[in-house]
Swiss-Prot record:
GO cellular component annotations of the record: Noc4p-Nop14p complex; nuclear membrane; nucleolus; small-subunit processome
Keyword annotations of the record: Membrane, Nucleus, Transmembrane, Transmembrane helix
Compartment annotation: Nucleus membrane; Nucleus, Nucleolus
The encoding gene: NOC4L
Record's bilayer topology term: Multi-pass membrane protein
InterPro entries: ARM-type_fold, CCAAT-binding_factor, Noc4
UniProt-recorded name of the protein: Nucleolar complex protein 4 homolog
Homology family: Belongs to the CBF/MAK21 family.
Length: 508
């Protein structure tokens, strides 16, 4: 079994420098076929090089080649440290390859071993500070780890979730963001803007859970311990925001798989925009996302809406783009509830021009003619709320001098520009026709337009996700009253009062 042999090799290498060559016995087992042998070798490497790092027996600084060290003017002590540093690098290379192993246990063990080396190199640096304010953080080693977490041809989400505990360290998180930014630029440039589904999903899995601090005083957990921390660039919240912003902008400037657009847009307002120095730089990504169509276009508009109202973005085509999303499918798609929830938010301002709101009311009404009952029970109160917010649009509810023939309706359904649709000149004959709908609840809801609307808006939150099955269940649970067939209750065949048959016949 490999375990006793590994223990003996470990004890020999740490006990006597004359046994240094036995380190190869440990490194060779990292390439073993048996999973248990590989796991034992990884644990042994962790113990071996952790001890050597703490004892200062690895060469620190710019590492010369092995051949140069043998021929150069180095002491025996320096030659040993240089040689062992090369074996340490061999170990790191083997462990990085094991991050792509078929066994998750091997991947996890390799990841934990490499991150232990990162922690120890942060404690006992093998590189010197490059300039004042910089730190001798093992960035190269961390880059090896990150590149192993974001492979191009396989899903690494499970291993990434195991790595997330290390992202709680401020310095680790900072350098991960820097490394990811570099990786995206290098990888995406090679494939000439084609989507890489596995790679981009892995990158998203790695960066989307990043929990940025809100204040600089909250940044207290560092893997690398330093006394003059206030001089670090890594300890500055502004530096973290810059790295965070650059990372996301680099990731989002490339074409994404369609499913990934939705995932990004869902977390955009909570997890990305609040931590950017210039949130309006997301305008290019949101414009591209709008062009994808469907629910992604809607979520992109939500991002634009946030930029307009919270970050003073000028975007005059916002409502035109929202208006263009209104088509017959909007009452049938599975994201209908989200659409009308956001549309209600977008149209909540009472300062919108009447012609714009009228265009939305009219198009929603026209599309309602072919909508299912469950959608109609939601959209009719939705339209009524728009009337309450914008009383100037109530001319649509009652226009006695309007055209008598529907073909003369001035509203131009095909017009993409709301201001040119002539909606304010029209009337809501569509909703009047719904008063004759086959479903009694729809007919009753549409009849409210014949009355004076109250000032209190209807709460449509409970209607947004109303389904056909819910309507059906509601109907079959109704208890029908007894239907009266006669004014007087019958008491027998000839029991009626003034019954002519009873006067002339008798049953004997």
């Amino acid at each position: 079994m490999a375990r006793p042999a590994l223990a003996a090799s470990l004890e020999a290498v740490l006990g006597d420098r004359g046994n240094a060559n036995r380190v190869f016995e440990i490194l060779e087992l990292l390439a073993a076929k048996e999973e248990e042998d590989v796991l034992c070798a990884a644990r042994t490497c962790r113990r071996l090089f952790a001890a050597l790092l703490r004892r200062g027996e690895l060469f620190a600084g710019s590492l010369p080649a092995e051949e140069d060290a043998l021929r150069g003017n180095y002491s025996a002590e320096e030659k040993y440290k240089i040689w062992m540093r090369h074996r340490y690098n061999d170990c790191v290379e083997s462990l990085s390859e094991l991050l792509g192993h078929d066994s998750f246990q091997v991947k996890e063990s390799s990841l934990c071993t490499l991150m232990k080396f990162v922690e120890l190199e942060a404690e006992c640096p093998l590189v010197a500070e490059q300039w004042k304010g910089s730190i001798a953080f093992p960035r190269h080693l961390l880059k090896v780890v990150v590149n192993g977490l974001i492979p191009i041809h396989e899903d690494a989400s499970l291993l990434i979730s195991r790595f997330q505990e290390y992202m709680e360290y401020e310095d680790v998180r900072y350098f991960v963001m820097k490394v990811v930014t570099e990786s995206i630029g290098q990888v995406m440039q090679k494939i000439k803007e084609r989507p890489l589904p596995f790679y981009q999903q892995n990158v998203f899995s790695l960066i989307s859970p990043i929990n940025m601090p809100n204040k600089e005083r909250d940044m207290v957990k560092f893997m690398m311990k330093q006394d003059n921390r206030e001089e670090w660039k890594v300890s500055k919240l502004q530096a973290h925001k810059q790295a965070f912003e650059r990372m996301w902008l680099t990731f989002l400037k490339h074409q994404l798989p369609s499913g990934l657009y939705k995932k990004v847009l869902v977390i955009l307002h909570d997890s990305i925009l609040p931590y950017m120095n210039e949130p309006t730089l997301m305008i290019d990504f949101l414009t591209v996302a709008y062009g994808v169509g469907g629910a992604i276009s809607l979520l992109a508009l939500n991002g634009l809406f946030i930029l307009i109202h919270q970050h003073n973005l000028e975007y005059p085509d916002f409502y035109k783009k929202l208006y263009s999303l209104l088509d017959p499918s909007i009452y049938h798609v599975k994201y209908r509830a989200r659409f009308f929830h956001l549309a209600d938010l977008f149209l909540s301002s009472s300062h919108l021009p009447a012609y714009l709101v009228a265009a939305f009311i009219k198009r929603l009404s026209r599309l309602a003619l072919t909508a299912p009952p469950e959608a109609l029970l939601m959209v009719i109160p939705f339209i009524c709320n728009l009337f309450r917010r914008h009383p100037a649009c109530k001319v649509l509810m009652h226009r006695p001098n309007g055209p008598q023939d529907l073909s003369e309706d001035p509203y131009i359904m095909e017009q993409e520009e709301p201001s040119e649709s002539r909606a304010l000149e029209s009337s809501l004959w569509e909703l009047q026709s719904l008063q004759n709908h086959y479903h009694p609840d729809v007919a009753q809801a549409a009849a409210i337009l014949n009355q004076s609307l109250s000032e209190i808006e209807d709460d449509i939150s409970g209607l947004l996700e109303l389904s056909a099955s819910e309507l059906f269940d509601k109907e079959i649970k109704k208890t029908s009253a007894n239907v009266p067939l006669e004014f007087e209750q019958v008491r027998g065949l000839f029991g009626k009062k003034n019954d002519i048959i009873a006067e002339h016949f008798a049953l004997d």
